[in-house]
Structure formats: structure tokens, C-alpha cells
């Protein structure tokens, strides 16, 4: 793995973790009835996912063009962070919707 690939992998880890943290903050805000903050944190989580996807797309493009992209524990870890972040954002949306329904009653 070269330095350029490592520089592309690290943001996946960072943005994936940021998405997960923001999604948890969104759930916590909704639990307290602060749906404006919940939406704000979900937006931040979505932006982190988008940023991570840009890095992932670059790596996929390199591989698709025939460039050697070595799979390392860092790359596996990065993909894990990204997928976990995506899962948390998806679940956060559903949980926030449930809190909104509960708050009505």
C-alpha cells in the first residue's frame, strides 16, 4: 500500500466514525424532543457519508482502471467504519421517526 492509498483510506475511517457519532447524537436529541437538532445531526451524518463515498469511489475507480490497489487491514477497517456509519444513519432515521410519533401522544 502506498502513501496515496493510505491517504484515501484514512478519511473513510474518519468520516464513517463521524457519521456514526452524528447519528447517535441525532437519536439522543430526538429522545429529548429536540427534533430540529436531530435533523441537524442527521444532515451532518449524511454529509460525512457522502464525503466517505467520494474516497471509496476513488479507490474503486483505481481498481477498475487496472491500477493495483492492495487490500490491507486498513482498507477492511475503513470499509467496516463506512458500512457501520451507513447502518447507524439508516437506523437513526427510523428511531427519530418513532420518537416523533411517540411525542404526538
Q: Where are the language model's segments positioned?
A:
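Terminal alpha-helical segments
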Residues: 1-105
Amino acid at each position: 500500500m502506498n502513501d496515496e492509498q493510505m491517504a484515501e483510506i484514512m478519511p473513510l475511517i474518519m468520516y464513517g466514525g463521524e457519521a456514526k457519532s452524528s447519528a447517535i447524537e441525532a437519536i439522543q436529541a430526538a429522545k429529548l424532543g429536540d427534533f430540529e437538532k436531530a435533523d441537524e445531526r442527521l444532515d451532518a451524518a449524511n454529509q460525512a457519508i457522502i464525503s466517505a463515498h467520494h474516497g471509496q469511489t476513488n479507490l474503486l475507480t483505481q481498481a477498475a482502471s487496472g491500477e493495483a490497489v492492495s487490500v490491507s487491514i486498513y482498507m477492511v477497517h475503513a470499509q467496516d467504519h463506512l458500512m457501520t456509519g451507513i447502518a447507524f444513519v439508516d437506523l437513526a432515521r427510523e428511531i427519530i421517526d418513532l420518537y416523533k410519533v411517540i411525542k404526538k401522544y
